[in-house]
């Protein structure tokens, strides 16, 4: 596990993020619930031990939460119908709700009504990354839980079929840079799997961004007319380990989903990806450090603080 120096993260956080984000604090629960972060960490560690795939699941959960209504735990709400945010087409396959619910249940035993579900999502993503041998970083906390979860609000999520210009636009709308796009999209895919449902559309014809040999591998794993729910690794060589191999795969035409592959067709994105390609420790450390910054930046999107929102008693329902 790579540990990122706290003072560097603090410096970046205060220099780069906006006013509302700066209201988040490192150690927000140090007095009201001192064991909050360790409780979440214990639950995540057990979940990833039982199923290593949970690491990527929890990382993806924070991404999808933050891109709709901001990082407010709105994706967790389940009213009972199909109009909730979690049922949006762009959230297909999003999971990890059970881990968040378990962490919340434990926190309510020790510190009832104190720790927000939005913060649990952010902490769980951090701990999941660390469990996958990725960087451990301090997470600013103090988010409050949102009150709105509407499927219509999730229509503009980044999609695996998006063009490079569309991806850039969607990230910029959230205050995220091209580098953040590379890190939070392709970089985050260093761990985890995807369903054949998202791959098969690329295989109708020979996609020029796919290595011909890899094209045949993908077609054998995700044949036309086959089970679209079959899952395959996003990082073909190390799906459970946080490393920079995903960038080499993309360069070599072994990107599994289109939204990863198209990044290398853009000159600016290509330069960013190439900067993380070296096998030396410095390059790997730079990727880990930059990924940490991008996660903290994303984790501050649209946060609710102070008297905004609420602290839910159950993560799946508003109070």
From Swiss-Prot:
Heme b binds at residue 189. The keyword Disulfide bond applies. The keyword Metal-binding applies. The record marks 60 as: Transition state stabilizer. Substrate binds at residue 158. It catalyses: 2 a phenolic donor + H2O2 = 2 a phenolic radical donor + 2 H2O. Binds 1 heme b (iron(II)-protoporphyrin IX) group per subunit. It is an enzyme of class 1 (oxidoreductase). Residues 1-22 form the signal peptide. Ca(2+) 2 binds at residues 190, 235, 238, 243. Glycans are attached at residue 280. One of its GO terms (molecular function) is heme binding. It comes from the Eukaryota. There are 73 peroxidase genes in A.thaliana. Removal of H(2)O(2), oxidation of toxic reductants, biosynthesis and degradation of lignin, suberization, auxin catabolism, response to environmental stresses such as wounding, pathogen attack and oxidative stress. These functions might be dependent on each isozyme/isoform in each plant tissue. This is Peroxidase 13.
């Amino acid at each position: 596990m790579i540990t990122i120096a706290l003072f560097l993260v603090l410096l970046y956080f205060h220099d780069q993020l906006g006013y509302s984000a700066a209201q988040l604090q490192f150690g927000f629960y140090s007095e009201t619930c001192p064991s909050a972060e360790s409780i979440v960490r214990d639950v995540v560690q057990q979940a990833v031990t039982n199923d290593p795939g949970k690491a990527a699941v929890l990382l993806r959960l924070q991404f999808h939460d933050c891109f709709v209504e901001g990082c407010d735990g709105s994706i967790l709400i389940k009213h009972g119908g199909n109009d909730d945010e979690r049922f949006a087409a762009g959230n297909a396959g999003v999971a990890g709700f059970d881990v968040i619910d378990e962490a919340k249940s434990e926190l309510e035993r020790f510190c009832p009504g104190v720790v927000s579900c939005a913060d649990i999502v952010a902490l769980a993503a951090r701990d999941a990354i660390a469990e996958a041998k990725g960087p451990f970083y301090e997470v600013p906390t103090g988010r409050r839980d949102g009150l709105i979860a509407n499927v219509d609000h999730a229509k503009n999520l980044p999609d695996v079929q998006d063009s490079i210009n569309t991806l850039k636009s969607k990230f910029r709308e959230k205050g995220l840079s091209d580098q953040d796009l590379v890190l939070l999209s392709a970089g985050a895919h260093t761990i985890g799997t995807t369903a054949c449902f998202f791959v098969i559309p690329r295989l109708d014809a020979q996609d020029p961004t796919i290595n011909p040999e890899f094209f045949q591998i993908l077609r054998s794993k995700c044949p036309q007319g086959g089970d679209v729910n079959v899952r395959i690794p996003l990082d073909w060589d190390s799906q459970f380990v946080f490393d920079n191999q995903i960038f080499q795969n993309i360069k070599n035409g072994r990107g599994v989903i289109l939204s990863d592959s198209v990044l290398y067709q853009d000159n600016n994105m290509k330069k960013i990806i190439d900067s993380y390609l070296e096998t030396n420790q410095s390059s790997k450390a730079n990727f880990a450090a930059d990924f940490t910054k991008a996660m903290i930046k994303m984790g501050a999107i649209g946060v609710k603080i102070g008297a905004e929102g609420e602290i839910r008693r159950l993560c799946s329902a508003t109070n």
